[in-house]
Curated annotation (Swiss-Prot):
Known function: Reversibly catalyzes the transfer of the carbamoyl group from carbamoyl phosphate (CP) to the N(epsilon) atom of ornithine (ORN) to produce L-citrulline.
Pathway: Amino-acid biosynthesis; L-arginine biosynthesis; L-arginine from L-ornithine and carbamoyl phosphate: step 1/3
Keywords, sorted A to Z: Amino-acid biosynthesis, Arginine biosynthesis, Cytoplasm, Transferase
Protein name: Ornithine carbamoyltransferase
Enzyme category, top tier: transferase
EC number: 2.1.3.3
Organism the protein comes from: Corynebacterium glutamicum (strain ATCC 13032 / DSM 20300 / JCM 1318 / BCRC 11384 / CCUG 27702 / LMG 3730 / NBRC 12168 / NCIMB 10025 / NRRL B-2784 / 534)
HAMAP family to which the protein is assigned, alphabetical: OTCase
Example GO biological process: L-arginine biosynthetic process
Catalytic activity: carbamoyl phosphate + L-ornithine = L-citrulline + phosphate + H(+)
Amino acid sequence: MTSQPQVRHFLADDDLTPAEQAEVLTLAAKLKAAPFSERPLEGPKSVAVLFDKTSTRTRFSFDAGIAHLGGHAIVVDSGSSQMGKGESLQDTAAVLSRYVEAIVWRTYAHSNFHAMAETSTVPLVNSLSDDLHPCQILADLQTIVENLSPEEGPAGLKGKKAVYLGDGDNNMANSYMIGFATAGMDISIIAPEGFQPRAEFVERAEKRGQETGAKVVVTDSLDEVAGADVVITDTWVSMGMENDGIDRTTPFVPYQVNDEVMAKANDGAIFLHCLPAYRGKEVAASVIDGPASKVFDEAENRLHAQKALLVWLLANQPR
């Protein structure tokens, strides 16, 4: 079987150029204001939504969003298909491409996407892998635009500063670096030694920052919170790491996002968390339940940003 390099997929944050990312974010705002204004899946046409990892927000937001676009979500978990059980991912993608308009997948190894992309003739969407979580970043950027750049739109993100505290060696930190740098935002990963991002992801973010003017910083110093417009954290123990034998609590205690940390940020700074959150662990209840917190707007924006992404991908495939 031949590869399909011309198909536009969204497997990583840098699969969109800065201009394309801005287009998606602008469309997301439109779809939030007019949820049923785009119906590219009218028919209904189908989208495969595949889960190797369990989810709440990903499943509900994609299922509802596909319905809003006029389509039908075929939701399948790993226990009810042959994926990874003898049939190759290449064969699976080739077959599914005959049935559906797009494939959305939440999986473990990021390399799985590259295997499916070899034969998929429809767009693949990474709804989460061990390396990256690019759909979440689109929702976060939409939330930041709403709160910090409502008049300018995505263009107003340029020069804003975001800081992420906690485990810097996970998919969220990787995507924040690349996705925010794509938007022209300065992004700082504040994490203890031994839990900082891998060089390959820092380099990808820096490369994108060279295009947009964004600065990428990796440090263990909380002083870096100064000047932040956005403060972000994530769970200290990501899914699948519960029993890896590594102490994922003690090193992160100094990096909890609490009132003291928020006081270091700019006046009017907002707090984001992709959820689920553990109050008293990575974030104090006073922060996540306080006025700076936009976590539920952020969760809602998964719906709108992912709809915009699907509309954009379906409209930008080779004819």
